[in-house]
């Protein structure tokens, strides 16, 4: 793991673009650690192995023009809108025990605090604002 973290924003609200951007960074990046930030507009993101039909209310998402996309990683279904900021950490470290999540969340929390926002790292992978 290097001391430097490369910061990237997609600049897009399109969930398909944002997930593809994340995948491209993962596969084509040079060595180093990366922090990606993005927002999706009215989207349900389902995990790689989930049954999307079982996770969503099709009539509701269609009536409210909510997009449904699938990510290439596991985990549960989540709803994204412009009220939340999404982030990914991509690192060279293959050793889970060497990967301290605090190394990635600390700069984000400090930046938010620098903007005058009360924030803190919480749980395994959340930053509360």
For the regions a language model picked out, list residue spans one by one.
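Active-site loop/lid in soluble adenylation, ligation, and acyl-transfer enzymes
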Residues: 1-55
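Short beta-strand
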Residues: 35-39, 78, 118-121
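Active-site cofactor/substrate anionic-group-binding motifs, chiefly glycine-
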Residues: 53-77
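Short, conserved charged micro-motifs
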Residues: 54-56, 95-100
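Residues forming anionic-ligand binding surfaces in small-molecule and nucleic-acid pockets
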Residues: 72-93
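Long, well-ordered alpha-helical scaffolding segments within enzyme catalytic domains
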Residues: 97-114
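Beta-rich nucleic-acid/ligand-interaction surfaces
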Residues: 121-129
